[in-house]
Amino acid sequence: PARGDSASWFETSVEYGLAGITRLGNSTVWLYGSSTFLTSFSTGQDLFRADTREMTRLEDLYSGIVIGSPDSDWSANFSAGRQNWQLNDGFLFSRFAAGANAGPYPALYLNPRTAYEMTALGKIKWKHLQLEGFYVDPAEIDYLDSDSTYAGANLSYTSPKGTEASLLFYQSPESNTVFPSPSGFIPREGMQTVDARLGSTALFGIQGLELFGEYAWQTHRDVDWDARAYYARAGYTFAKLPWTPNLSYRYASFSGDDPSTQTYERFDA
């Protein structure tokens, strides 16, 4: 974004509000919730603008219920509202949404706004298995809001020895977004994705040695859509060093559309 040889800017943000959790009598049921506002400020040249601007907006506004005790084999957690959410390690649904911090919004590089515009989340855990259902509306720039929503379920397994595996299905039941193609415009609404993830944080029994991979296949209920995405990541966590640093390398690939075919092949991430 620099004009000339260099550019300078300053940005800051602060989030403030109330959050709490309470137990219902002597039961194994807890109620929780949060309401916060976020004030952000920028001055100088960032990627989009060079003026001075400030913004205060609602960030979190959610409530939920947790059922279960720490010594139980099972637990459940249900919540709804504006809140931060991430699926697995964020390959497909990340807690950091670029669209919620771009354009006119201050503090672009700090990326302070992380709440989804709306969520309905449910988790049921039994021993090492967890089933998570979700319906989310990502936060987007107001005047570019595509009204896209996503609904799905993720079944995951985590072993005491560090092995992790998950199987995911989700779709977009509502969206105003369309993608251009040689055969016309392709709607996001109706897009479906199947995803599998496998990895370990203690590969070959070596604690801290990590290897993870994930593969996603995307189709559509109404049009010819065949897109793929995957990543592989290897790393090591130095647990005995201060701050437990992690050194890793990740390779990721997302398919693009081939205009010479009638099939739409661009992965929608």
Question: How would you describe each model-predicted region?
Answer:
Residues 87-88:
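Hydrophobic alpha-helical segments and helix pairs
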Residues 2-14, 20-78, 91-100, 104, ...:
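Surface-exposed loop and membrane-interface regions of Gram-negative outer-membrane beta-barrel proteins
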Residues 84:
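Short, glycine/serine-rich, charged loops/turns that create anion-binding
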Residues 265-269:
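Flexible internal linker/loop segments at domain or repeat junctions
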Residues 81:
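Glycine-rich, aromatic-flanked loop segments that form ligand/cofactor-binding clefts
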Residues 24, 72-78, 101-263:
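Signature for the C-terminal beta-barrel architecture of outer-membrane proteins
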